[in-house]
Regions:
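Conserved core of the sugar-phosphate nucleotidyltransferase
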Residues: 127-215, 222
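Generic C-terminus detector
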Residues: 283-306
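Short, surface-exposed amphipathic charged segments that create phosphate/polyanion-binding patches used
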Residues: 87-98, 163-168, 282-286
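Short beta-strand-to-loop acidic/aromatic patch adjacent to the donor-nucleotide binding site
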Residues: 114-124
Length: 306
């Protein structure tokens, strides 16, 4: 079995936040959130990281992030560009929005041939998540089904005081396997608990605190990249017709299709750790405070890459 690889999705545009939050420092040493994730992954056993970025940020990204990690881990860069489409497909004129997380991952198909974990660059998952991913990926292989894993977080640990968020709300069976994910695009804190709305805030449905949600923290066997490739044209046929400027090939949607087709299982491992992220600029202070506190507790050294 090959050594698992960490894939970090860092090509997104950060539309709600403004600016390149993938590289935005969250401590006095200049580390970004993704430095902490890569550090946690390295401690868990990962030896190689692949960053999915855009050509436009390559120089800055290599200079600010890559350079300090390269002495400690094998680093590769993959580029998610709009025009990376199958033969016969074209980007609609005027479209600037990337084609989503499934497309980002598909861009890795020529450099990754091992089990892999996938994370968002701008989410903080905590050391335990990476240990669970590494342990799973080094002990599980596909049999007659694809065998995947997802690290879920309790919704109460993933919402911000500063606005609404989008979360994949998970239904899990009694054996801890994923039944379905429902993307709720507007969840916010209302009083003591989280709630979602489907009608622009006219009515709200509460979500219990311990409900597991997906934060794009997955573990896949190598064959998943082929699945993404095989399913992409059908997505484009539909998406480019219905929403040419906005359609996105979402990673969880592809997983959901495989579950419906009974071709895969996804074991859900719940992390009780708090998730941190900067969806809104106002979130940054709480992330910085949390990082500072974890350093004081000895979870992280002052400088990660010394």
């Amino acid at each position: 079995m090959k050594e698992p690889v960490l894939i970090v999705m860092a090509a997104g545009m950060g539309s709600r936040y403004g600016g390149l939050k993938q590289m935005d420092p969250v401590d006095e040493q200049g580390h970004a959130i993704l430095d902490f994730s890569v550090y946690d992954a390295k401690k868990a056993g990962f030896k190689k990281v692949v960053f999915i970025i855009k050509h436009a940020i390559e120089k800055d990204f290599r200079e600010i992030v890559g350079k300090r990690i390269e002495p400690f881990m094998e680093v590769e860069y993959v580029f998610q560009e709009l025009d990376k489409l199958p033969e016969g497909y074209q980007v609609p004129e005027g479209r600037e929005k990337p084609f989503g997380t499934g497309h980002a991952l598909l861009c890795c198909k020529d450099v990754v041939d091992a089990p892999f974990a996938v994370i968002n660059a701008d989410d903080y998952y905590g050391p335990k998540a990476f240990q669970m991913l590494y342990d799973y990926l080094t002990t599980h292989e596909d049999d007659d089904l694809y065998r995947y894993v997802m690290i879920a977080f309790h919704i109460e640990k993933t919402i911000t005081e500063n606005g609404h968020v989008s979360r994949g709300v998970c239904q899990v069976d009694k054996n801890h396997y994923l039944k379905e994910i429902t993307e709720r695009t507007r969840i916010e804190k209302r009083g003591a608990e989280a709630a979602f709305t489907l009608d622009d805030g006219a009515s709200w449905t509460p979500v219990p605190d311990k409900t597991p949600v997906s934060m794009n923290c997955w573990g896949f066997t190598p064959g998943f990249l082929k699945v993404l490739e095989d399913k992409f044209p059908a997505f484009l046929d539909k998406g480019l017709k219905e929403k040419p400027m906005k359609c996105e090939y979402f990673l969880p949607s592809v997983v959901e299709e495989l579950l419906k087709e009974k071709r895969a299982t996804v074991e859900v491992m719940e992390s009780a750790e708090k998730w941190y992220g900067v969806t809104y600029k106002e979130d940054k202070k709480s992330v910085m405070d949390a990082i500072s506190e974890m350093k004081q507790q000895g979870v992280y050294p002052e400088d990660l890459w010394k």
